[in-house]
Amino acid sequence: MKKVIAAIGLFTAGFSLIAPALADRGNDDRDEHGDGRSALAVYGDAPYGCKAPTAAAAPDECPVGSAYKPDSPDGPNPGDPRQLEATPAFIEAVNNDRKVSLVVHVGDIHSGSGYCTLAYNQRVLDLWSDYKDPLVYMPGDNEWTDCQKSKEGGGVKNSAGEYVDYAAGHPVANLSLVRSMFFPQAGETLGRHKREVTSQAQAFDPAHPSDAEYVENVYFMQSQVLFVTMNIPGGSNNDDDLWSAGAFGATKSAPQIQEAAQRTAADLRWLETAFAVAKDRGAKAVVIVSQSDMWDLDGTGPALTHIANYEPFIAKTAALTKDFGKAVLMINGDSHHYRSGNPLVDNAPCVVETGVGTATAPCAEDDYDTHPYYPDGVPNFHRLVVHGSTFPLEYTRLTIDPRKNYPASANAIGPLSWERVIP
């Protein structure tokens, strides 16, 4: 039996710029209920590994009796393996949810203290092969940008003098590894029953041929709603956290600067393309999926400076949403705690997860203050952060009913509604 956790919250919409080479491949408008409705299971930050049990660690992360493995260069991937071990049952529960016809993972397949290895990636990929429905995946910062950190194995060698991480933790090399393993065919999802989507590798602007590298950026239509994914990693959009391991020193390197600038530009063009497609097809809403929680003051200081490089994405999203005029939902992972609200409206209602496995409570702070926009705000926007990293494992069931037009709340907007599900 599944436990459904109630929530309470708000929503958004966008702009139109028809980019060259708009591909129409694989964007059939799925109707899984015969009446236009469909539902997705959305989650992230799993399978995760808890931090070592210390006085400072959250009490739910490594409970007494957990099989925590010390961080040792000569040992297996460090961390608590319980979520990996629980993943088959979780996948089975999602498969048995008769309402769900598509799965979305918003990134982070291991913790910020786990090694970045081909073997670990393969283990997760093998587990995911049991999803019967299509699986759309967006890589998180722990899979690539943070691989250079020593706590993820960056620059760390074992007793044989070998680097424990793939490519010594080189971020670009690890993103290439993730692409080769999880995106072997552009425009095709994971899962046993794959479906076609449109990838930026297929529908890139010919004026910017390097955009074809971003095979992980996709869009697709589902029940008259356009979904678009963008590779925006958590932390600082990979701009402020220096690549300090492997071949990189203690200052920002040219490869790091180039990577962030090129990806940011490609993402913004992709977002414009997606909204143009949504307007062209008469979509009733747009759902934006990215890993980063761009409003999260994560304790890395100075906090506002650390998230300042998300400004181009938020400004573009706000402008496109206002122009679109219909509901726009952004779904993020990254910060681990379920959150529902509209950070593009000052003092908007907001709810946040107050403890593992519990319902929500009003937010203590206003995310609008970190990226303030427009005197009148963007009322047709809503942002949802899905739960992750801790037990119990859960997913958010996102239901689309194109016949509905819900007022903005903590658990619905436009044709979209959602609920937290603990299998």
Cite the ranges covered by each PLM segment.
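Bacterial N-terminal signal peptides
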Residues: 7-16
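Sec/Tat signal peptide C-region and signal peptidase I cleavage site
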Residues: 18-23
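N-terminal active-site segment of His-dependent metallophosphoesterases
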Residues: 24-119
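Short, solvent-exposed loop/turn elements at domain surfaces
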Residues: 38-40, 48-54, 229, 236-240, ...
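Active-site glycine-centered loops adjacent to acidic/histidine catalytic or metal-binding residues
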Residues: 45, 107-108, 140-141, 291, ...
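Extended active-site neighborhood of metal-dependent phosphoesterases/phosphodiesterases
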Residues: 61, 115-263, 337-340, 345-401
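His/acidic metal-ligating clusters that form di-metal
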Residues: 87-102, 221, 228, 242-345
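A short C-terminal boundary segment appended to hydrolase-like catalytic domains
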Residues: 382, 390-423
